[in-house]
Design a protein with these regions (language model features):
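C-terminal structural segments of small proteins and small subunits
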Residues: 66-91
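Short S/T/G/P-rich N-terminal loop/turn motif that feeds into the first structured element of a domain
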Residues: 1-55, 61-71, 94-96
Length: 96
């Protein structure tokens, strides 16, 4: 099995308090499932048609681990706490 990289791009954040509460739950839930956080924050530089918005880069040991992490009860609870306070996009790619 190859590693998987997950890129999360935030398009809009409407409530910073809910985002902070989400992060307190989401980080440990994802780490428990095997996630390694590689980068998080606002890009220092964007090119072409890029938008400087909050971005997270995560490494997973496998597709299965990424799926199980997202679908875990603890991560789903984090999503409930987020309560729509962020519009974001998740992308998953197999490592080379």
């Amino acid at each position: 099995m190859s590693k998987v990289y997950q890129v999360v791009v935030y398009h809009e954040i409407s409530n910073q308090e809910k985002l902070a509460a989400y992060a307190e739950l989401a980080g440990p839930a994802m780490k428990k499932a095997g996630a390694i956080f590689l980068a998080r924050g606002i890009p220092y530089l964007v090119r072409e048609d890029g938008v400087a918005s909050r971005t997270v880069l995560i490494e997973w040991p496998s597709r299965q681990a990424a799926d199980e992490g997202y679908n875990s009860a603890s991560y789903q609870e984090a999503i409930r706490v987020l309560d729509g306070a962020a519009k974001r996009e998740f992308r998953y790619m197999d490592a080379l």
